Amino acid sequence: MAKPFDVSKFRKGLTKSIDGVSFGFSDPTDWISTGNYALNYLISGDFNKGIPLGKVTVFAGESGAGKSYICSGNIIKAAQEQGIFVILIDSENALDEAWLKALQVDTSPEKLLKLNMAMIDHVAKTVSDFMIEYKTLAEE
């Protein structure tokens, strides 16, 4: 018979190997509306909430389904209205400044950083580097 999985040992190993790892749940307290009550409800269970801050959110779907409009127009605009600096990673290099401005997105460098990259390794490195830098600044 196989030994049961030792969760305590696994947890200790993670704690030693990954700096800053935490365990348990952290329920979001801040949300950004998608601009669509039905979509907000599908994502959060609340017509007014939408996507949670502090969590990774991915929009995927068929071409022409409206992902770019929802993310670029509604979510970025709502985030900026809450005073949030937005980092937009455009994996298809498909979003142009005129279109974003037409959706009332502030494209100034003080409000938005748009990055064009298609390789998942580049995205992962960029996000990791940003998180390290952000954590360092927050600790100062």
Where are these regions (language model features)?
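The Walker A/P-loop phosphate-binding site
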Residues: 2-110, 120-136
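Conserved P-loop NTPase "ATPase switch" module shared by AAA+ and STAND
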Residues: 139-140
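A contiguous pocket-lining binding segment that forms or flanks enzyme active sites
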Residues: 115
